[in-house]
């Protein structure tokens, strides 16, 4: 008997295949290209590959009719929601690669005429040699030689590939593989910080260990669900659950599965890794994780909830209610006490997870489209905020010495008004102030939740947003209305691409607050999951 080859829909998979091909090409470039050519080649591959993949997403989206198509024997669902999320991930990736590329070592006088390193103004957030012991002679020699980390670009593209497959997964086994593919490179990239190496490595280790535990819970949940339903496909699980009368094993499987998904989005009580990892990781990686990972993880959560779990609606909805309330409350209250800007933004991101869960709990088309819009708005604001935080350097202005201590930011907006205004815009968006994207996104998820009967959840969300405004405004007051001290940090001058990317984030944040209807319509059209 001849085993038939599976039919692979290459056209539908083109965006994902392009990203993985770029990642493989990046690995080959590291192996075979001379060191002096690697930086330019890696940046070109990452930016060009992401742009081509984004074009492929648009082309595939224009060819999709109806609810979408299943590919690779039903393992991948290519529908409008998948393509919307993949496009968002790729937009975030393009900006993240720009910020990663900007943080390159200063060129030493001995190497001015070589192409070994990028000629950028000392914005280096990455260690020159990961294998070197922090503070060792090997590390100092690498710094003097002007070495740069180029391995992070193929690592980032591998993670992006996993992020694109994760929300498209139509069976639990594919979802688990995608989860590991997106997570493993992130564990490594979190430990690449140039400054405070030990803090960075500690953050990477915490993320790795807790991520491994959450993956184990996820996999055990997959096993229990398979035992209860006899299938791994999400539509098959839905049909099997609808026909069952005893849901005890299935509920246990769903609970364990939820641990893995809620850990990845950073919901309470699975959020303990977020502040340490966000603070310890290089700031470009922090922004990348905070935006792209949430988009992918919430996409997977939406697919599981909306496709596989409708028969268990009455069981999972009260649990998500409690988790959303805890997440909004804990994230907001804890952020109030933070004196480090990166940790404050980390706890702020926890609170935003609660707001996004409000849209998921709505469990209706309005909730799905509102969640998609929220993810877009939040991604641009988050990338812009962390990009600016990464530009704030210690009073000596030295490369790698990022200064996120809020007490040092007094008068920063007076010294660098443009940077202060841009960061203020992102903070006001996080607070949900009108005429920013944050107001429209919060209004959309709260309205969807209220229409589904979750009025108490909306009340908690509104109160949390009001409290959160305090610590956002506190940063603005410190920058503009407090006299600068002697240790006020400097704002490093980024390159043209980084300036353009930050400007794009600012413009999108404002435009989505003033004229959000085109993106709201796009999110509404994308609110179709292949069932």
UniProtKB/Swiss-Prot annotation:
Domain of life: Bacteria
GO molecular function terms noted in the UniProt entry: NADH dehydrogenase (ubiquinone) activity; NADH:ubiquinone reductase (non-electrogenic) activity; quinone binding
GO cellular component: plasma membrane
EC number: 7.1.1.-
NAD as UniProt keyword: yes
Entry keyword Transport: yes
Recorded catalytic activity of this chain's protein: a quinone + NADH + 5 H(+)(in) = a quinol + NAD(+) + 4 H(+)(out)
Swiss-Prot/TrEMBL keywords: Cell membrane, Membrane, NAD, Quinone, Translocase, Transmembrane, Transmembrane helix, Transport
GO biological process: ATP synthesis coupled electron transport
Functional note: NDH-1 shuttles electrons from NADH, via FMN and iron-sulfur (Fe-S) centers, to quinones in the respiratory chain. The immediate electron acceptor for the enzyme in this species is believed to be a menaquinone. Couples the redox reaction to proton translocation (for every two electrons transferred, four hydrogen ions are translocated across the cytoplasmic membrane), and thus conserves the redox energy in a proton gradient.
PANTHER family: NADH DEHYDROGENASE (PTHR22773)
Quaternary data: NDH-1 is composed of 14 different subunits. Subunits NuoA, H, J, K, L, M, N constitute the membrane sector of the complex.
Similarity remark: Belongs to the complex I subunit 2 family.
Name recorded for this polypeptide: NADH-quinone oxidoreductase subunit N
């Amino acid at each position: 008997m001849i085993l038939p080859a599976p039919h692979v829909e290459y056209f539908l998979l083109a965006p994902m295949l392009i990203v993985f091909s770029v990642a493989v090409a990046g690995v080959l470039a590291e192996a075979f290209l001379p060191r002096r050519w690697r930086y330019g080649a890696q940046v070109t591959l990452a930016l060009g590959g992401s742009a081509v993949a984004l074009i492929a997403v648009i082309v595939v989206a224009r060819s999709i009719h109806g609810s979408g198509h299943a590919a690779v024997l039903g393992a991948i669902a290519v529908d409008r929601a998948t393509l919307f999320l993949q496009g968002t991930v790729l937009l975030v990736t393009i900006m993240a690669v720009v910020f990663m590329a900007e943080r390159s070592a200063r060129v030493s006088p001995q190497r001015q005429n070589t192409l070994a390193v990028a000629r950028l103004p000392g914005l280096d957030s990455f260690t020159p040699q990961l294998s070197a012991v922090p503070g060792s002679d090997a590390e100092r020699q690498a710094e003097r030689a002007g070495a740069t980390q180029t391995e992070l670009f193929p690592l980032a593209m591998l993670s992006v590939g996993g992020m694109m497959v994760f929300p498209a997964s139509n069976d639990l086994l594919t979802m688990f593989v995608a989860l590991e593919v997106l997570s493993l490179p992130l564990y490594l990239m979190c430990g690449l910080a140039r400054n405070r190496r030990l803090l960075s490595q500690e953050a990477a280790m915490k993320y790795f260990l807790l991520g491994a535990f959450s993956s184990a819970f996820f996999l055990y949940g997959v096993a229990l669900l398979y035992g209860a339903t006899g299938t791994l496909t999400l539509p098959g699980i839905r049909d099997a659950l609808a026909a069952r009368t005893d849901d005890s094993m299935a509920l246990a499987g769903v609970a364990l599965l939820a641990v893995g998904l809620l850990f990845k989005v950073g919901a309470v009580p699975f959020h303990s890794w977020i502040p340490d990892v966000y603070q310890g990781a290089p700031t470009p990686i922090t922004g990348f994780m905070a935006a792209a990972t949430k988009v992918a993880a919430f996409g997977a959560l939406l697919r599981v909830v909306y496709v596989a779990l409708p028969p268990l609606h009455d069981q999972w909805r009260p649990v998500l209610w409690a988790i959303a309330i805890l997440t909004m409350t804990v994230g907001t209250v804890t952020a109030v006490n933070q004196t480090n800007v990166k940790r404050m933004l980390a706890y702020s991101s926890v609170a935003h997870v609660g707001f996004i869960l409000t849209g998921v709990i709505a469990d209706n088309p309005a909730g799905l489209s509102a969640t998609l819009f929220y993810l877009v708005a939040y991604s641009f604001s988050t990338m812009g905020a962390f990009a600016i935080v990464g530009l704030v350097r210690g009073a000596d202005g030295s490369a790698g010495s990022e200064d996120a201590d809020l007490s040092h930011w007094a008068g920063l907006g007076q010294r660098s008004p443009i940077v202060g205004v841009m960061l203020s815009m992102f903070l006001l968006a996080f607070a949900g102030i009108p005429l920013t994207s944050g107001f429209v996104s919060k209004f959309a998820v709260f309205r969807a939740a209220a229409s589904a009967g979750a009025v108490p959840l909306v009340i908690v969300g509104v109160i949390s947003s009001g409290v959160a405004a305090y610590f956002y405004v506190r940063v603005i007051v410190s920058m503009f209305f407090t006299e600068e001290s002697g240790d006020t940090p400097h704002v490093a001058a980024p390159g043209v691409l980084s300036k353009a990317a930050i400007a794009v984030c600012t413009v999108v944040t404002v435009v989505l607050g003033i004229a959000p209807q085109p993106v709201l319509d796009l999110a509404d059209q994308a609110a179709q999951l292949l069932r």
